[in-house]
Swiss-Prot record:
UniProt function note: Catalyzes the NADPH-dependent reduction of 7-cyano-7-deazaguanine (preQ0) to 7-aminomethyl-7-deazaguanine (preQ1).
Keyword Flavoprotein: no
Gene3D superfamilies: 3.30.1130.10
Key words, A-Z: Cytoplasm, NADP, Oxidoreductase, Queuosine biosynthesis
Presence of the UniProt keyword Acyltransferase in the record: no
Catalytic activity: 7-aminomethyl-7-carbaguanine + 2 NADP(+) = 7-cyano-7-deazaguanine + 2 NADPH + 3 H(+)
Originating species: Staphylococcus aureus (strain NCTC 8325 / PS 47)
Enzyme Commission (EC) number: 1.7.1.13
Organism lineage: Bacteria, Bacillati, Bacillota, Bacilli, Bacillales
Protein name in UniProt: NADPH-dependent 7-cyano-7-deazaguanine reductase
Pathway: tRNA modification; tRNA-queuosine biosynthesis
Binding residues for substrate: V79, E80, S81, H98, E99
Domain of life: Bacteria
InterPro entries listed in its UniProt record: GTP-CH-I_C/QueF, NADPH_dep_7-cyano-7-deazaG_red, QueF, QueF_type1
Protein location: Cytoplasm
Length: 166
């Protein structure tokens, strides 16, 4: 029989259930929190669908909107979802290109969790008639996950969807 988590396992989780949250409008990677993966002997994906991502164009200051898909195979640590929400919200006034934002997010999550594998895919709404969909991934070096990352990168968008102004 599976048992729930004990209080001592949750002591580093401070945002979930906290009604007194601060919503930062400037980039804040320090808001990310993690917890232990209780299923380390098994490979499995965790996927976050984040349809309300916003950042700013570094040149014009105009807002950019995207749905971000974050998928990872955890190792020892996992990201806590409310902290991820607040972290993504902190990009609201962050001025960077779409490609930079996706790589920053992936790098911050790698630093937090040290996952076996992670991918971050941003599907931005069109501006000027062009949508940009940066995809970035990482697999632990010298492991099957490194090979997996290479394979997924080469095959990630073989059947692109019809763009219908999202």
């Amino acid at each position: 029989m599976a048992h729930g988590r004990q209080q001592d396992e949750l002591q580093d989780i401070t945002l979930l259930g906290n009604q007194d949250n601060t919503y930062n409008f400037d980039y804040r990677p320090d808001v990310l929190e993690s917890f232990d993966n209780k299923h380390q002997g098994r490979d499995y994906f965790v996927k976050f669908n984040c349809p309300e991502f916003t950042s700013l164009c570094p040149i014009t200051g105009q807002p950019d909107f995207a749905t971000i898909y974050i998928s990872y195979i955890p190792n020892v640590k996992m990201v806590e979802s409310k902290s991820l929400k607040l972290y993504l919200f902190s990009f609201r006034n962050h001025g960077d290109f779409h490609e930079d934002c996706m790589n920053i997010i992936m790098n911050d999550l790698i630093e937090l969790m040290d996952p076996h594998y992670i991918e971050v895919w941003g599907k931005f709404t069109p501006r000027g008639g062009i949508s940009i969909d940066p995809y970035t991934n990482y697999g632990r070096p010298n492991s099957k996950y490194e090979k997996m990352a290479e394979h997924r990168l080469m095959n990630h968008d073989l059947y692109p969807e019809k763009i219908d102004n999202r």
